[in-house]
Amino acid sequence: MDVKNLTKKYDGKTVVDSVSFEIPKGKVTSLIGPNGAGKSTVMGVISRLIARDGGSVNFESQDISKWKSKELAKRLAILTQTNNIQMKLTIRELVTFGRFPYSGGHNTAEDEAIIDKAIAYMELQDIQDQFIDELSGGQRQRAYIAMVIAQDTEYVLLDEPTNNLDIYHASNMMKIVRRLCDELGKTVILVLHEINYAAFYSDYICAFVDGKIKKFGTVEEVMTKENLAQIYKVDFEIMEIEGKPLSIYY
């Protein structure tokens, strides 16, 4: 995925300003930055949920606007911050939605097998008949990830997947993100506020400030106290844990 000179305005105000970057295939790339930096807007544009005002997003050598929705949904899955489905659904029924681009709602035995596999991968077999609105936040997020796995796309876009989760469930969610890449071969792009999760679980980090890219590179290249101080306007210290540069800020 190649983004060039991407621009987005709201009410005349530029919120994404001529942004260009390329997403490394088969890796985890985290978008970080302060509130209002443009991270989620960029995510919305590259997933085609938000219309752009300028620039291009090339996906498999074709601008993303030219893809038919059904074909794009076989290659790219998006999980937004808010996933409030206004229906009484069980976990299995939710995960079944992941097969819609392929089956159109008429699942084959192969579709059902893929659904079974996705539910098992997220260890939801024992509660697959429970309703989504009866689950804990962590269980619900795992159910949505199972739906994404059932969609069987090469690219997975996650907008703040740890939002509203406690430390235990948030860290488990990040382990799942890592597994999507390492075990299932996905290219994962996610928006994160917790920079230490980005540092520990990502391969690359793209840091935004005021609608522009401040720094893009490997975790080691981005996670310096000088870079982070420029991005967040607070003081940082960097320490290494398990070979990863993690930050202390105050």
Predicted region positions:
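Helix-to-loop junction immediately C-terminal to a conserved catalytic motif
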Residues: S47
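The feature captures the beta-strand-to-loop junction immediately N-terminal to the Walker
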Residues: I32-P34
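Conserved ABC ATPase signature
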Residues: F131-L135, Q139
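Catalytic Walker B motif of ABC-type/P-loop ATPase nucleotide-binding domains
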Residues: V156-E160
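Conserved ABC transporter NBD signature motif
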Residues: G55-D63, L72
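Conserved ABC ATPase "signature" region
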Residues: T96, A109-I127, D152
